[in-house]
């Protein structure tokens, strides 16, 4: 089974949303692939569960989240060797964080351009 890791800053919005949508579609289409998610700065934010606007959007898509009440996961807490593909949601935001993390130096990462808008504030989330 192919394993994909979506990565954002806090693992409460973009990466969690991507994980839920991907897995919903993979199950529906009977694909041998699953998504997971993690954050680069988990612990710097108050909220550790999926962000309310992400839940609202999932509901609009008729997707029931599988990890709704689970806490966010820091990328350093995962065995990164188990993933076939690692995707950071926003190159401009995440590439500097990746470069500062010694655990990610040799990791092959694909960068997307999904900006955190509105920017999730640390004191809100």
Which residues make up each language-model segment?
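Active-site loop/turn elements of alpha/beta-hydrolase fold enzymes
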Residues: 40, 91, 114
């Amino acid at each position: 089974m192919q394993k994909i890791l979506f990565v954002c800053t806090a693992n409460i919005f973009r990466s969690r949303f991507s994980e839920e949508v991907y897995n919903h579609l993979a199950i529906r289409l009977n694909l041998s692939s699953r998504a997971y998610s993690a954050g680069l700065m988990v612990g710097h934010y108050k909220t550790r569960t999926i962000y309310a606007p992400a839940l609202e959007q999932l509901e609009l898509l008729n997707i029931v989240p599988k990890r709704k009440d689970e806490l966010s996961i820091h990328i350093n807490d995962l065995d990164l060797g188990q993933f076939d593909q690692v995707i950071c949601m926003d190159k401009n935001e995440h590439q500097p964080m990746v470069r500062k993390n010694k655990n990610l130096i040799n990791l092959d990462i694909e960068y997307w351009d999904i900006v955190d808008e509105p920017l999730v504030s640390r004191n809100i989330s």
